[in-house]
């Protein structure tokens, strides 16, 4: 499910200044 996770990352990146995966 790497592609789905990638889409989630892009969504979070657009929604937040700091991506959630940075933590």
Swiss-Prot record:
GO terms for biological process: lipid catabolic process. Expressed by the venom gland. GO terms for cellular component: extracellular region. GO terms for molecular function: metal ion binding; phospholipase A2 activity; toxin activity. It comes from the Eukaryota. Contains 7 disulfide bonds. Keywords: Calcium, Disulfide bond, Hydrolase, Lipid degradation, Lipid metabolism, Metal-binding, Neurotoxin, Presynaptic neurotoxin, Secreted, Toxin. It is an enzyme of class 3 (hydrolase). Binds 1 Ca(2+) ion. Heterodimer of an acidic subunit and a basic chain. The acidic subunit is non-toxic, without enzymatic activity and comprises 3 peptides that are cross-linked by 7 disulfide bridges. The basic subunit is toxic, has phospholipase A2 activity and is composed of a single chain. Snake venom phospholipase A2 (PLA2) that shows presynaptic neurotoxicity. PLA2 catalyzes the calcium-dependent hydrolysis of the 2-acyl groups in 3-sn-phosphoglycerides. This is Basic phospholipase A2 CB1. It comes from Crotalus basiliscus (Mexican west-coast rattlesnake).
